């Protein structure tokens, strides 16, 4: 038989098999657009604005639908009811971490953010317990954050009211808090190694939100065979991990099991106590990836939120004025802010919540995965299926937040000006995979922002109406545009 004819017949059979398989799977899964072989529904998604693509598809197929990202079926949950029903009401089933190939390759299934099964359960339980032992939610952590807020204010004073890009100054403060928790140390804001570390973190954040990375996560083979920014991501990730591995080696040499100093010490002590088959057993690589997860999550997300908060306060000076008036009334000029103040500052609390709602930092959450077969809203979702939960659709729900595209602290105030909570507020996700550092993040946002506004007036370089608050990138995260401002001592 003609070899060319054999090749054509083989390819035709593979094509038909692919169509049949997708048709069979689609018959069980929630409805969705018809996928093309190999590439799936990728042409129906704008990689520069995935959120809008998901919203458009939800209008056609409802709040629970299936997309094929490449050949892999992915269930998308859109809107508060669907997200809450999955992550809270069926929390155990939806607690798996879906595949994110760029992180799968970097972490090799270890750490706290991208692991699954017993590795994830043991690591998360240990991490939460250790963070509590180190003072999470207690006065000792608050003291650390307050001290770092003081250092941040002093560093901002050194700008002498001149225009500056706040990116790295705002990154130093949360990074130092994480450093103090992980290896009981902090850095001077001008330390070259420290700034290099922050540059790597900032670059990671930007790379993860590029359209190219979204394509790579859909077609993982590109990670191994194509040039691109993903290679820089792996270099930066390895740099941070190796930096932390060196800290781990130093801790191993100076460890006193009777007096654990920090997260690394607690992990080393725990690892020595466990059985050989336990995931925490003397595993430096696992420890390094765990603290790298905490490092990236605790530094870059907070730095980005603080940066975006200042941009919004520049854009809306009437909001800034109200916050500063409340600071003056409750705290005054000479006492440093503390967490007890928050309950007496409803407008400031509302402003911080509105910043997090409006910037929509991780629009589509990190992917989840169902840990067993489940019948969800009369649809069958088989074990191992990746699930995307659109946090953007929750944070921008017009029924809960009128005019959701408008920045308005009133979204979190009642008719009497008192702060009001909302079940729809889930920037940290919700359920079993909710951010482990949520409490610390809330504390940092309040203490850092109130400390800045207590000591400085924010001066933009252009008229507020000309300030662009459109994200520079929207991918895994939302990245604010670059800007400069002046910190004028008040």
Curated annotation (Swiss-Prot):
Phosphoserine carried by residues: 127
InterPro entries: Cyt_P450 (IPR001128), Cyt_P450_CS (IPR017972), Cyt_P450_E_grp-I (IPR002401), Cyt_P450_sf (IPR036396), Cytochrome_P450_fam2 (IPR050182)
Membrane topology: Peripheral membrane protein
Keywords assigned: Acetylation, Endoplasmic reticulum, Heme, Iron, Membrane, Metal-binding, Microsome, Monooxygenase, Oxidoreductase, Phosphoprotein
Reactions this protein catalyses: an organic molecule + reduced [NADPH--hemoprotein reductase] + O2 = an alcohol + oxidized [NADPH--hemoprotein reductase] + H2O + H(+)
Gene3D superfamilies recorded: Cytochrome P450 (1.10.630.10)
Modified residues (N6-acetyllysine): 252, 375
Enzyme class, broadest EC rank: oxidoreductase
One Gene Ontology MF term: oxidoreductase activity, acting on paired donors, with incorporation or reduction of molecular oxygen, reduced flavin or flavoprotein as one donor, and incorporation of one atom of oxygen
Induction: P450 can be induced to high levels in liver and other tissues by various foreign compounds, including drugs, pesticides, and carcinogens.
Cofactors (names): heme
KW Acetylation (keyword) present: yes
GO biological process: arachidonate metabolic process; linoleic acid metabolic process
Enzyme Commission number: 1.14.14.1
Tissue: Expressed in liver.
UniProt subcellular location: Endoplasmic reticulum membrane; Microsome membrane
Entry binding sites for heme: 435
Record-linked Pfam families: p450 (PF00067)
Gene Ontology cellular-component terms listed: endoplasmic reticulum membrane
Role summary: Metabolizes arachidonic acid mainly to 12-hydroxyeicosatetraenoic acid (HETE).
Family: Belongs to the cytochrome P450 family.
Protein name stated in the entry: Cytochrome P450 2C54
Lineage start: Eukaryota, Metazoa, Chordata, Craniata, Vertebrata
Gene label: Cyp2c54
């Amino acid at each position: 038989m003609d070899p060319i004819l054999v090749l054509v017949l083989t390819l035709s059979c593979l094509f038909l098999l692919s169509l049949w398989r997708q048709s069979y799977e689609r018959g069980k899964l929630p409805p969705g657009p018809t996928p093309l072989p190999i590439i799936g529904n990728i042409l129906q998604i704008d990689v520069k604005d995935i959120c809008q693509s998901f919203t458009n598809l939800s209008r056609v197929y409802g709040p629970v639908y299936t997309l094929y990202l490449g050949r892999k079926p992915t269930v998308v949950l859109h809107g508060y009811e669907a997200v809450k029903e999955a992550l809270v009401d069926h929390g155990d089933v939806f607690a798996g971490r879906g595949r994110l190939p760029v992180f799968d390759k970097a972490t090799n299934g270890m750490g706290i953010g991208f692991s699954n099964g017993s590795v994830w359960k043991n690591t998360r339980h240990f991490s939460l317990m250790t963070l509590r032992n180190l003072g999470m939610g207690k006065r000792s952590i608050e003291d650390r954050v307050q001290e770092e807020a003081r250092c941040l204010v002093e560093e901002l004073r050194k700008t002498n009211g001149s225009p500056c890009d706040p990116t790295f100054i705002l990154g130093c403060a949360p990074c130092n808090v994480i450093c103090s928790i992980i290896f009981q140390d902090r850095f001077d804001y001008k330390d070259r190694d420290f700034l290099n570390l922050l540059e790597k973190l900032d670059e990671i954040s930007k790379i993860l939100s590029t359209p190219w990375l979204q394509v790579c996560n859909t077609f993982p083979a590109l990670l191994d065979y194509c040039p691109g920014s993903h290679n820089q991501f792996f270099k930066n990730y390895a740099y941070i991990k190796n930096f932390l591995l060196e800290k781990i080696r130093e801790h191993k040499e100076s460890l006193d099991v009777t007096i654990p100093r920090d997260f690394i010490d607690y992990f080393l002590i725990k690892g020595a106590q466990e059985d050989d088959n336990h995931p925490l057993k003397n595993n430096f690589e696992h420890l390094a990836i765990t603290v790298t997860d905490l490092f990236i999550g605790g530094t870059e997300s907070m730095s980005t939120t603080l940066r975006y908060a200042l941009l919004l306060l520049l854009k809306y000076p009437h909001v800034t004025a109200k916050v500063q008036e409340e600071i003056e009334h409750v705290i005054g000029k000479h006492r440093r802010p503390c967490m007890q103040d928050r309950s007496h500052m409803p407008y400031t609390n509302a402003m911080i919540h509105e910043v997090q709602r409006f910037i929509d930092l991780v629009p589509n959450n990190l992917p989840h995965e169902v840990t067993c077969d489940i019948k969800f809203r009369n649809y069958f979702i088989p074990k191992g299926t990746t699930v995307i939960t659109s946090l953007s659709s929750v944070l921008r729900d017009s029924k809960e937040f009128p005019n959701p595209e408008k920045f308005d602290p009133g979204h979190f105030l009642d008719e009497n000006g008192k702060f009001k909570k909302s079940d729809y507020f889930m920037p940290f996700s919700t359920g079993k995979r909710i951010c482990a550092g949520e409490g610390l993040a809330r504390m940092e946002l309040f203490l850092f922002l109130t400390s800045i506004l207590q000591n400085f007036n924010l001066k933009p370089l252009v008229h507020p109406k000309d300030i662009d608050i459109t994200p520079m990138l929207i991918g895994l995260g939302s990245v604010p545009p670059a800007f400069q401002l002046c910190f004028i001592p008040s």
